[in-house]
């Protein structure tokens, strides 16, 4: 057997010795516990704090910090008998105001949190400290807030779950809808243009939907009259004709419309507003369709052509008149 196994370890049978918990205080020589029979006769027994032990206050003196640190570094033997603590002398602080038996090496004032507050040792209970912490985090309903109130008319109204445009007071349910509205109506920029007709849009999705207008495919057919459409939204609007549903009335003349956009365009006749302005000559129009037709004068684009003489026209109404007058077609 190797020699290392024959040598007795110094740590052997340590379980027979009294153990000291890591969280228990280290007793300096001044606080070395003494048996009960060696304590003075007038020493009070702190049965409420230590049922089986008492502490001796006779040798409790304030020592310099250097000597106290050296004494705390030493390991004192565990007490075998009860610990007796004598009454403090005159001039010392009473028991309620005296420091605890184990004094931490740090200060509670230096324990600052990330919220800019510092904790202080609560004199009574821990509940007051937790309550103070929660009030510092979430605020007290009894204390008026120093922050300004939200401007519900600016962007967002929590009570109504709506987003308001500050220029036209139009209401949107999502911030994305408000952003698109501002870019289309108030920014004056429509960066997405159609390569075929030159029509501009404020959003790429609108341009993608517009490209179906130039295609000949009509995949959305009405089941009532058989009319086909290129876009599903156009079919939905067409179905309102069969149901004779006109939920949007004009506030000036009472005329009703199938769509809200048609009603809004109609109100421009009464108000005289012309929000659609030509970027080339500055001429303004009340309808966006009129601006599109006007822009073809500057670009020379003629999307409507006669199948008999291949003559092109900028407006569809001009093509119909040409067929009636030149080719006697209706």
UniProtKB/Swiss-Prot annotation:
Post-translational modification: Methylation at Lys-8 in the SNAG domain seems required for the recruitment of the corepressor complex.
Region (Mediates interaction with GATA1): 164-330
Region of interest (Disordered), residue spans: 1-42
Induction: By GATA1 which binds to GFI1B promoter in cooperation with the transcription factor NFYA. Target gene of transcription factor E2-alpha/TCF3 that promotes growth arrest and apoptosis in lymphomas.
Molecular functions (GO terms): DNA-binding transcription activator activity, RNA polymerase II-specific; DNA-binding transcription factor activity, RNA polymerase II-specific; RNA polymerase II cis-regulatory region sequence-specific DNA binding; RNA polymerase II-specific DNA-binding transcription factor binding; sequence-specific double-stranded DNA binding; zinc ion binding
Gene: GFI1B
Entry remark concerning the domains of this protein: The zinc finger domains are essential for erythroid expansion and acts as an activation domain whereas non finger domain serves as repression domain.
GO CC annotation, single: plasma membrane
Residue span of region SNAG domain: 1-20
Tissue spec: Expressed in bone marrow and fetal liver, but also detectable in fetal spleen, fetal thymus, and testes. Detected in hematopoietic stem cells, erythroblasts, and megakaryocytes. Overexpressed in bone marrow of patients with erythroleukemia and megakaryocytic leukemia as well as in their corresponding leukemic cell lines, and markedly repressed in severe aplastic anemia (SAA).
List of residues that carry N6,N6-dimethyllysine: 8
Alphabetized UniProt keyword annotations: Activator, Chromatin regulator, Developmental protein, DNA-binding, Metal-binding, Methylation, Nucleus, Proto-oncogene, Repeat, Repressor, Transcription, Transcription regulation, Zinc, Zinc-finger
SUBUNIT field: Component of a RCOR-GFI-KDM1A-HDAC complex. Interacts directly with RCOR1, KDM1A and HDAC2. Forms a complex with GATA1. Interacts with histone methyltransferases EHMT2 and SUV39H1. Interacts with ARIH2 (via RING-type 2). Interacts with RUNX1T1.
Result, substituting residue 290 to S: Prevents DNA-binding
PANTHER family assigned: FI21258P1-RELATED, ZINC FINGER AND SCAN DOMAIN-CONTAINING
Positions annotated as zinc finger (C2H2-type): 163-186, 192-214, 220-242, 248-270, 276-298, 304-327
Keyword hit for Protein transport: no
Function: Essential proto-oncogenic transcriptional regulator necessary for development and differentiation of erythroid and megakaryocytic lineages. Component of a RCOR-GFI-KDM1A-HDAC complex that suppresses, via histone deacetylase (HDAC) recruitment, a number of genes implicated in multilineage blood cell development and controls hematopoietic differentiation. Transcriptional repressor or activator depending on both promoter and cell type context; represses promoter activity of SOCS1 and SOCS3 and thus, may regulate cytokine signaling pathways.
Pfam families in the record: zf-C2H2 (PF00096)
BP term (GO), one: regulation of transcription by RNA polymerase II
Protein name per Swiss-Prot or TrEMBL: Zinc finger protein Gfi-1b
Localization terms from the record: Nucleus
Reported disease: Bleeding disorder, platelet-type, 17: An autosomal dominant disorder characterized by increased bleeding tendency due to platelet dysfunction, and associated with macrothrombocytopenia and red cell anisopoikilocytosis. Platelets appear abnormal on light microscopy, while electron microscopy shows a heterogeneous decrease of alpha granules within platelets. Bone marrow biopsy shows increased numbers of abnormal megakaryocytes, suggesting a defect in megakaryopoiesis and platelet production.
Stretches for region Interaction with ARIH2: 91-330
């Amino acid at each position: 057997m190797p020699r290392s196994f024959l040598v007795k370890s110094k740590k052997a049978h340590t379980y027979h010795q009294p153990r000291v918990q890591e969280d228990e205080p280290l007793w300096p020589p001044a606080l070395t516990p003494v048996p009960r029979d060696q304590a003075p006769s007038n020493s009070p027994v702190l049965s409420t704090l230590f049922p089986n032990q008492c502490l001796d206050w006779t040798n409790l003196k304030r020592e310099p910090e250097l000597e106290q640190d050296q004494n705390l570094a030493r390991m004192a033997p565990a007490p075998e008998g009860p610990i007796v603590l004598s009454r403090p002398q005159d001039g010392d602080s009473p028991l309620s105001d005296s420091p605890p038996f184990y004094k931490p090496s740090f200060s509670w004032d230096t324990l600052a949190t990330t919220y800019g507050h510092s904790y202080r040792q609560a004199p009574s209970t821990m509940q007051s400290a937790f309550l103070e912490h929660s009030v510092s985090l979430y605020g007290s309903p009894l204390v008026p807030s120093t922050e300004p109130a939200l401007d519900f008319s600016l962007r967002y109204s929590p009570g109504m779950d709506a987003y308001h445009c500050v220029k036209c007071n139009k209401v949107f349910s999502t911030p994305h809808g408000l952003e698109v509205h501002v870019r289309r109506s108030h920014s004056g920029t429509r960066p997405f243009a159609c390569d075929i007709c030159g029509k501009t849009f404020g959003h790429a999705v609108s341009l993608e939907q517009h490209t179906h207008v130039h295609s000949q495919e009509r995949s959305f057919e009405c089941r009532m009259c058989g009319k086909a459409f290129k876009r599903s939204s156009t079919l939905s609007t067409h179905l309102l004709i069969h149901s004779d549903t006109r939920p949007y009335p004009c506030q000036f003349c009472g005329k009703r419309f199938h769509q809200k956009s048609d009603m809004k365009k109609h109100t421009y006749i009464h108000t005289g507003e012309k929000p659609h302005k030509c970027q080339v000559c500055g001429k303004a129009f009340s309808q966006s369709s009129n601006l599109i037709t006007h822009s073809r004068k500057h670009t020379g684009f003629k999307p409507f052509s006669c199948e008999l003489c291949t003559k092109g026209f900028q407006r569809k109404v001009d093509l119909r008149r040409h067929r009636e007058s030149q080719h006697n077609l209706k």
